């Protein structure tokens, strides 16, 4: 839907790039940009595999001060299947490679199959694979108005780690 892109632009981001395999998502993002009083022509949309796109950015030395990575739990495309539990570290590594020095990576999942500890581990493994030191500076979960019922841990699905690049 482009919600993160809209918020980034509204907060003053000089450049906003949205990567999603589903082309229809980009049409919605441009429409939401327009509805928010933003020029949709200023939103760069890339309908492609995120990991491959991050690799291309790294090859071109393109870097970002802030990366918001909120992958789907599962998706499939021409390059194969993406499974968040299996592929998070790869996504973290690609993100770390294009994160500017002193940049921030917002890494999120709403998968019940990924714990907060597994999210942290993916960030650590991805950072190490990229040769980048990432430090988690904040963790966010569900807000208080989304209580989780006792005995239903699957209800605590949202995990977000905000990491800073320190090397």
PLM segments and residue spans:
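C-terminal catalytic and target-recognition region of SAM-dependent MTase-like enzymes
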Residues: 90, 104-167
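Conserved SAM-binding motif I beta-strand of class I
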Residues: 15-20
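Mobile active-site "lid"/loop adjacent to the S-adenosyl-L-methionine
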Residues: 24-25, 47, 64-94
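Amphipathic, non-transmembrane alpha-helical secondary structure
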Residues: 6, 51, 55, 89-96
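Helix-to-beta-strand junctions that scaffold the AdoMet/dcAdoMet cofactor pocket
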Residues: 99-101
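Flexible loop/turn segments at secondary-structure boundaries
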Residues: 3, 25, 53, 75-77, ...
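Conserved SAM-binding loop of SAM-dependent methyltransferases across substrates and taxa
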Residues: 3-14
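S-adenosyl-L-methionine
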Residues: 22-68
């Amino acid at each position: 839907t482009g919600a993160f892109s809209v918020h980034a632009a509204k907060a003053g981001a000089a450049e906003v790039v949205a990567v999603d395999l589903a082309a229809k998502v980009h049409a919605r993002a441009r429409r939401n940009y327009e509805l928010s009083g933003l020029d949709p022509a200023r939103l760069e949309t890339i309908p492609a595999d995120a990991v491959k796109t991050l690799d291309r950015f790294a090859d071109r030395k393109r870097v970002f001060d802030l990366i918001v990575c909120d992958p789907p739990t599962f998706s499939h495309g021409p390059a194969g299947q993406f499974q968040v539990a299996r592929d998070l570290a790869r996504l973290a590594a690609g993100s770390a490679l294009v994160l500017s020095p002193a940049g921030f990576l917002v890494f999120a999942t709403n998968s019940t199959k990924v714990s907060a500890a597994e999210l942290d581990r993916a960030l650590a493994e991805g950072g190490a694979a990229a040769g980048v030191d990432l430090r988690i500076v904040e963790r966010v979960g569900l807000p208080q108005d989304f209580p989780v019922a006792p005995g239903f841990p699957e209800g605590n699905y949202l995990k977000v780690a905000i990491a800073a690049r320190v090397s």
